[in-house]
């Protein structure tokens, strides 16, 4: 699997791995890259079956497989210890990495994540699946911003959204791959295993997230032994895109604090 690695800003700089959500594209994290590469070696990638890592995914494709293939690619690139920043599905992959490779994951940041899918989130995905089946890729892509962004943010950026729609259609991961990745997300359940995650965790959520209720992050916080929760008042599901200034400040402060906390504990 292809990875994109930034040059380390200094010798032995910590590594931060960015894992996007269901869309799978590493470019999702563009608003964070400029600030992160000043302090960390940053790894971005298109998830298997998407973007520049095309593949046909098996029907039983799972979050555990997503975690294993990423870890193997990191080790092959000479990276054995790393912090993980995951958004939604990416946060699930991050938790799986922390469970399966505890010696490798130094810190986990969960952005609008959950222990197991909430009934409201499941309902949103059911609607989106119906759109996919009835209207194809175009219907899926055109509906997606409604679940990602606040209404006023979208209304002020109509040309940008049109350009994003065109790009998403041109690079659509395919119906079968999308549904298999979505099914992996829906099957994931960390409610009985989260207390085994021992690395420090920063939980970031947005109070106006239409797709994932903030209660999901509260449940995560209660279940994870060494976690802290930050709530953004605005930003929607893709709060790192809509309010990068606020998000980046939380992320940079959290990473620095938790990495120091981790090193002090060793």
From Swiss-Prot:
Keywords from the named record: Hydrolase
GO-annotated biological processes: nitrogen utilization; uracil catabolic process
GO molecular function: hydrolase activity, acting on carbon-nitrogen (but not peptide) bonds, in linear amides
UniProt cross-references to Gene3D superfamilies, sorted A to Z: alpha/beta hydrolase
EC numbers, comma separated: 3.5.1.-
Coiled coil region boundaries: none
Catalytic reactions on record: carbamate + 2 H(+) = NH4(+) + CO2
Any Pfam family hit: Abhydrolase_1
One cellular component term from this protein's GO annotations in UniProt: membrane
Top-level division of the source organism's lineage: Bacteria
Purpose of the protein: Involved in pyrimidine catabolism. May facilitate the hydrolysis of carbamate, a reaction that can also occur spontaneously.
Family per similarity comment: Belongs to the AB hydrolase superfamily. Hydrolase RutD family.
PANTHER family cross-referenced by the UniProt entry: HYDROLASE ALPHA_BETA HYDROLASE FOLD FAMILY (PTHR43798:SF27), MONOACYLGLYCEROL LIPASE (PTHR43798)
NCBIfam families: RutD
Listed name of the protein: Putative carbamate hydrolase RutD
Organism expressing this protein natively: Escherichia coli O1:K1 / APEC
Lineage: Bacteria, Pseudomonadati, Pseudomonadota, Gammaproteobacteria, Enterobacterales
The encoding gene: rutD
């Amino acid at each position: 699997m292809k990875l994109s690695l930034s040059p380390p800003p200094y010798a032995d700089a910590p590594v931060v791995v960015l894992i996007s959500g269901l869309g799978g594209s590493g470019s999702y994290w563009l608003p964070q890259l400029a600030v992160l590469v000043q302090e960390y070696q940053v790894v971005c990638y298109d998830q298997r079956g998407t973007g520049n890592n095309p593949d046909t995914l098996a029907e039983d494709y799972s979050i555990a497989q997503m975690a294993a293939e990423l870890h193997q690619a990191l080790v092959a690139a000479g990276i054995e210890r790393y912090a993980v920043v995951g958004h939604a599905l990416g946060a699930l992959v991050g938790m799986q990495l922390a469970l399966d490779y505890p010696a490798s994951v130094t810190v986990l940041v969960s952005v609008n994540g959950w222990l197991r899918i909430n009934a409201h989130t499941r309902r949103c995905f059911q609607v989106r699946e119906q759109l996919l089946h009835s209207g194809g890729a175009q219907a899926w892509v055109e509906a997606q911003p409604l679940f990602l962004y606040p209404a006023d943010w979208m209304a002020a950026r109509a040309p940008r959204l049109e350009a994003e729609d065109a790009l998403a259609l041109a690079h659509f991961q395919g119906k079968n791959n999308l549904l298999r990745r979505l099914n992996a997300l829906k099957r994931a359940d960390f409610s009985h295993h989260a207390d085994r995650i021992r690395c420090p965790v920063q939980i970031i959520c947005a109070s106006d997230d239409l797709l994932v209720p903030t209660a999901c992050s509260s449940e995560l916080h209660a279940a994870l032994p060494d976690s802290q929760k930050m709530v953004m008042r605005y930003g929607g599901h893709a709060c790192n895109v809509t309010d990068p200034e606020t998000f980046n400040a939380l992320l940079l402060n959290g990473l620095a604090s938790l990495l120091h906390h981790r090193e002090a504990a060793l």
